[in-house]
Amino acid sequence: MRWLGYLILAGLAASAAPGGSVTKHRSVFDDLADRARSLPAEFAANALLRLAEAPALTDVAKKRGILEDAFELAAGAQQPFARRNWTGSPGSLFDKAYAQGLDACTLQCRAVHDMLAIDYRKAREMFGEVQPPHIPRLDCEDALVYDVSIFYVTAGEMAARAFNAKEVADEEPFQLLLRYAGDLTSPAQLAPIARMLVTASLKPVQFEALLGSFAGALEQVEGDDRSFSGTVPGDASAAIADLSAECARRKINAQGLQAAWQAYLARQLSGARCADSVARRPQPSLGAGVKPASIDGKAQPAGECKSPECRKLATQFSSLIVGPNGFGLTPEQKMTSEWGGRLQQYLAALAEWTEDDDPVEYFQAKSRIYSDLYNVTPNGPNRDLLLSTLLIWLQGNSYQRDHRVEWFYPVNTLIIHAFADPRGMRRTMLALQRSADPVIALYAQLEQLLPRPMAGTIGLL
């Protein structure tokens, strides 16, 4: 059915007036944009950005207006920044939820990036309204750390592309970067700022000034161990090495940077540490004399299956993947009507599981069970039934109100799965587009009209 989306896009492009405006099919595009604006902030902004990035939208004025709306709406997103598991690898299904690009910082920076292609002055004005990262301290129990790299990538892009020759001569790009080079208050900012400096096109004296500002801030910053251990070893260490190499290439003395880096490591490693951070290998080595002042708790995985009903369903799940002989069921065995009947019984039991005392555990655990079911169910009617059942549960779920990003993650993966198999998932595709939930319906229609490339979605699965 994707041919329909391509036909609509072709119609939008073909109906553009000489000035670039969409005429005949204007209502198709404008209806989607109007519906998007009525959604909660992050869903509205993301949908508008997808529309603004559509190749068929050649009307620059219309695109500009949509980008401005998306930028303003993005400020109301529930999540201020992207997040990731502190180890660098997803520890649970929902760690990926915070990498969907639905946080305020990512959405606003994306709007700025898109605006830069059509109006660099407006893009610069918009970026000036993006709040610089002020990152909350985390506890050892937190499994997710903040990722603000998009902000500093965008700052570097502004310095490189958002100024004319006179403004460059007046050192305005340098002043922009100087504003952020020394504004280091959390370990989560260290690597992004260092990389921003590495890629900056600057005169030697300007580079030295930024380097000095960054090193001075690095010498003073003291962050929580969870944020620190989420970047060292690994991201921060590599970024400092890259910055040192850039200093060598420019023949600039990096001793001040290295001294600040070593002082930073000593300060963090001798402070309060998290138990799982201390146990992690490899550890930065500063000698036997550097020991933690205290060793506290460890990260708590979210959405564990603790309730009796959840544990019961988890036990019953094994009958769908393991036969009486103790061996895993083959794809051929799962294609039988007998297995299909057991799946339907299990789906009925899953549907009867109502919310527990802990809404986070309930939503995450039930979503994980649906995800596991999808992975073991062969293509065909049973998989289509499974996705339809999941849709019914999601579209009436109150979890969306306070946990939009997490609620949308299974919605997003459901849309990706369904539209990746238009023949086998025809019923689910139609149900998604006709959903009573306005977010689900609009995003399904966007997927039909503006399908995302697999490279952009595979990491979410």
Question: Which residue stretches match the model-derived regions?
Answer:
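Non-catalytic all-alpha helical scaffold/repeat segments
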Residues: 15-461
